[in-house]
Design a protein with these regions (language model features):
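Adenosine-cofactor binding site in Rossmann-like domains, unifying the SAM/SAH pocket
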Residues: 3-23
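Structural motif
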Residues: 28-29, 66, 228
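NAD(P)-dependent short-chain dehydrogenase/reductase
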Residues: 105-149, 155-156
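Conserved C-terminal active-site "lid" loop/helix of NAD(P)H-dependent oxidoreductases
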Residues: 181-187, 202-247
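Mid/C-terminal beta-alpha module of Rossmann-like enzyme folds, strongest
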Residues: 160, 166-211
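NAD(P)H-binding glycine-rich loop region in Rossmannoid oxidoreductase-like domains
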Residues: 9, 21-52
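Catalytic helix-loop patch of NAD(P)-dependent Rossmann-fold dehydrogenases
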Residues: 44, 51-56, 75-114, 118-119
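SDR active-site strand-loop-helix element
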Residues: 10, 33-34, 67-73, 77, ...
Length: 247
C-alpha cells in the first residue's frame, strides 16, 4: 500500500508535536510514536501530558495523511479479568491512560490505533534495562506481582506495524503472545541473562505510586488479519541478544 522508498525519522528537535507542523515534505504515512509516557508524572501534570498525547496527536493528524498512533493497555481498568479485545469499552484509571484514550480520538478516521503493552527493547528507558542494572547492583529486587500484562518487544511490534498498512483503519490490539506479572518478567530477565538476583514479590500498594495501574491488562485481538507476535519470552531473548551485541 505504501512505498517505503524513503523513511525520515523526526526527533523533538525537528518537531515539537505540541506545536503545529513545520514545513515538511508531505509523507505517505506517519508513524506517531511521540508521547508522554511518564505514567506517574501525568498525575502531577495532566495538562502537559494532554498537550503531548492529545494536542500533539491532533497536530500530527492535521497533516492529513494516514497515521499509525501507538496507544496502550492502560486505557482499560483491569476489571474484566480476561484478555481485552478491540470491542471492549475503555475505562482508564490514570491521567496517562485518559490522555492516550483521548489521543486515539484525536488521531482521526484515517488512522490505525495500535494498542500494545509493556514495551521493551535494547535502547531507551524500559523494564528490561532497569532490571539488568538493578540485578547487577543488588542481590534482591522487589517487584510487583499483582499486575498482569503482555511484555512486548519493540522489534516484533515494528514488524507487525508494517503489515497493518494493508488492513483497514481502526483499533488493533497488537501485543506479544503469553502473559505474566512484572515479578514473573523480572525472574525471566535474570534467568535469561544469567544474573543471580532474587525477586521479592510485593503488592502494588507497597510502592505507593501516584497513578493507579490496571491489575489485568492482557490484550488479544478478535480482528481478522491482525499480525501475530511471538511469545514475550522470545522477544526477551531477542532483546538480550541485541544488548549483548552492542557491548
Amino acid at each position: 500500500m505504501f512505498a517505503a522508498d524513503r523513511v525520515v525519522g523526526l526527533t523533538r528537535a525537528d518537531w515539537d508535536v505540541t506545536r503545529p507542523a513545520p514545513p515538511l515534505d508531505t509523507p505517505e504515512l506517519v508513524l506517531h510514536a511521540a508521547a508522554w509516557t511518564d505514567v506517574d508524572g501525568a498525575e502531577a501534570d495532566p495538562q502537559e501530558a494532554a498537550a503531548v498525547n492529545v494536542g500533539g496527536t491532533a497536530n500530527v493528524a492535521a497533516l492529513g495523511v494516514p497515521l499509525v498512533y501507538f496507544s496502550t493497555d492502560y486505557v482499560f481498568d483491569g476489571s474484566k479479568g480476561e484478555p481485552y479485545v478491540e470491542a471492549d469499552a475503555p475505562s482508564p484509571l490514570s491521567a496517562y491512560g485518559r490522555t492516550k484514550l483521548h489521543g486515539e480520538a484525536a488521531a482521526g478516521d484515517r488512522s490505525w490505533i495500535v494498542r500494545s503493552s509493556w514495551l521493551f527493547g535494547p535502547t531507551g528507558h524500559n523494564f528490561v534495562r532497569t532490571m539488568l542494572r538493578l540485578g547487577a547492583e543488588r542481590g534482591e529486587v522487589a517487584v510487583v506481582d499483582d499486575q498482569r500484562g503482555c511484555p512486548t518487544y519493540v522489534g516484533h511490534l515494528a514488524e507487525a506495524v508494517l503489515a497493518l498498512a494493508e488492513l483497514p483503519y481502526g483499533v488493533w490490539h497488537v501485543a506479544a503472545e503469553g502473559d505474566c506479572t512484572w515479578a514473573d518478567f523480572a525472574e525471566a530477565i535474570f534467568e535469561e541473562a544469567g544474573i543471580r538476583c532474587r525477586v521479592r514479590r510485593i503488592g502494588s500498594e507497597e510502592l505507593q505510586r501516584p497513578a493507579r495501574r490496571p491489575a489485568y491488562s492482557v490484550l488479544r485481538s478478535e480482528r481478522p488479519g491482525v499480525p501475530r507476535l511471538p511469545h514475550w519470552r522470545e522477544g526477551l531473548r531477542h532483546c538480550l541478544e541485541r544488548l549483548e551485541a552492542a557491548h
